């Protein structure tokens, strides 16, 4: 219901989560600009969050899919973002992540290592501390995954923001010419 709304505005929903008990419930929507081949995309600024929040509010108010009161919260996933979609494991290949599975694989449920991309529906991870060991497990087994804050991640985030600013400035220049 909300993916088409986000996509029509140029965003992708990363995670949708209803939190809280019967009181003070919060519908959290994490969204971002799609990652592009030139490295731009990714994070959202405050204006983007407000724009998506207004559009989503209209749809939710009309459809009323959630009984009772709740607070709508729209945010960017942040630099040490959760990995919630299969494509995230490909998009962020080469970066360090923590992954938790719903079952034991390779003798454990929790892993930390460098993302090795995706093969079919299998998530690849180069295991930390073990020479040249890459494990693959079904995406369906992943219950929690998140990028780890590293210098490489910070550098990638800075490049994405720079590419986004450049793109925004080009858009602004084009609109001023019109």
Curated annotation (Swiss-Prot):
Q: Where in the cell is it found?
A: Cytoplasm
Main subcellular location of this protein, as a coarse class:
cytoplasm
UniProt keywords (A-Z) are: Cytoplasm, Ribosome biogenesis
- What are the GO cellular component annotations? cytosol
InterPro entries reported for this sequence: Ribosome_maturation_RimP (IPR003728), RimP_C (IPR028998), RimP_C_sf (IPR036847), RimP_N (IPR028989), RimP_N_sf (IPR035956)
Q: Which one Pfam family would you cite for this protein?
A: RimP_N
GO biological process terms on file: ribosomal small subunit assembly; translation
Similarity section = Belongs to the RimP family.
What's its job? Required for maturation of 30S ribosomal subunits.
Q: Could you tell me what this protein is called?
A: Ribosome maturation factor RimP
Organism, as annotated: Caulobacter vibrioides (strain ATCC 19089 / CIP 103742 / CB 15)
Record gene name: rimP
């Amino acid at each position: 219901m909300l993916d088409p709304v986000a996509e029509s505005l140029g965003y992708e929903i990363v995670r949708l989560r209803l939190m809280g008990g019967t009181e003070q419930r919060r519908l959290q929507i994490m969204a971002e600009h799609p990652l592009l081949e030139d490295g731009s995309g990714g994070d959202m600024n405050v204006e983007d969050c407000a724009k998506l929040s207004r559009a989503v509010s209209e749809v939710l108010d009309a459809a009323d899919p959630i009984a009772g009161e709740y607070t709508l919260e729209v945010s960017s996933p942040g630099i040490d973002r959760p990995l919630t979609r299969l494509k995230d494991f490909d998009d962020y290949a080469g970066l360090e992540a923590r992954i938790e599975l719903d079952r034991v694989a390779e003798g454990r449920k929790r892993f930390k290592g460098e993302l090795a991309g995706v093969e079919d529906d299998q998530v690849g991870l180069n295991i930390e501390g073990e020479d040249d060991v890459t494990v693959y497990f079904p995406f369906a087994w992943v219950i929690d995954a998140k990028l780890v804050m590293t210098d490489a991640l910070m550098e990638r985030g800075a490049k994405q923001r720079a590419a986004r600013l450049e793109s925004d400035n080009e858009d602004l220049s084009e609109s001023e010419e019109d």
